[in-house]
Amino acid sequence: MSIVVARLAGGLGNQMFQYAKGYAESVERNSSLKLDLRGYKNYTLHGGFRLDKLNIDNTFVMSKKEMCIFPNFIVRAINKFPKLSLCSKRFESEQYSKKINGSMKGSVEFIGFWQNERYFLEHKEKLREIFTPININLDAKELSDVIRCTNSVSVHIRRGDYVSNVEALKIHGLCTERYYIDSIRYLKERFNNLVFFVFSDDIEWCKKYKNEIFSRSDDVKFIEGNTQEVDMWLMSNAKYHIIANSSFSWWGAWLKNYDLGITIAPTPWFEREELNSFDPCPEKWVRIEK
């Protein structure tokens, strides 16, 4: 039987895109799926490898022996950012492409980012099940009930390396306070009794600048003390979403359980203009200047 390998890199959101692409390909090719984790040996950013915290069978992870043998007989498909050279045989696409379907026979390894829902949209329900955290404590379950039962808005504010790392800031840029103010206004003009649940990798900053973003009459709750997987799961239970330009943010909204909800995303997604052909947001999402 042929094998589909998804090489993982980056934080949780990126890992989920890479897994979703590999999963969809493995189902469509009737192949077994393996995860290549070689990049995590010395990788500690963003919590390192995180998919083992989700409802994913760990037998999918390649052994050291498999990683040594596999590259000798595969064709690699690469979906990459410009000027990022990864290997000699490439499948390059700056935008969504299905060119590889049917054109690659046998075993294949997918290396890259694959940040477009069309690669795996038809598997959404299964992915929602797979991407559920395996450890959700009672407090988080009770909070999820509150989120589901209110006119809830998940607000994700990404700071972290977007603030501390100059190169990351040049690539991604940072969502401004004005973006959040405009997004909140957009929802308040359409819905009543909104409750804002704020998620962030810098929750203290959010608390400090609450009055710069929210009005005094807004019902705002700051969510903290959870793992990132549980935070994402809680976000997915909200009716409406205001996301940052972050793959973590993207998944919190895309996995939502309320199909009638609105998702607001920043534009442009990247600070570097040439990267915006990689914009991952579905067309139906509302876009507001970041």
UniProtKB/Swiss-Prot annotation:
The annotated pathway is: Bacterial outer membrane biogenesis; LPS O-antigen biosynthesis
Residue ranges the record marks as coiled coil: none
Per the record, the GO terms for biological process are: fucosylation; O antigen biosynthetic process; protein glycosylation
Which reactions appear under catalytic activity for this entry?
GDP-beta-L-colitose + beta-D-galactosyl-(1->3)-N-acetyl-D-glucosamine = alpha-L-colitosyl-(1->2)-beta-D-galactosyl-(1->3)-N-acetyl-D-glucosamine + GDP + H(+)
Q: Does the keyword Transferase apply?
A: yes
Q: What class of enzyme is it?
A: transferase
GO CC annotation: what is one?
membrane
The record describes the dependence of activity on pH as: Optimum pH is 7.5-9.0. Exhibits 60% activity at a higher basic condition (pH 10.2).
* Cofactor binding remark: Does not require a metal cofactor.
What regulation of activity is recorded for this protein?
Addition of metal ions dramatically decreases the activity to 0-40%.
Q: Does the keyword Glycosyltransferase apply?
A: yes
UniProt similarity note: Belongs to the glycosyltransferase 11 family.
**Protein name per its UniProtKB record:** Alpha-1,2-colitosyltransferase
Q: Which organism does this sequence originate in?
A: Escherichia coli
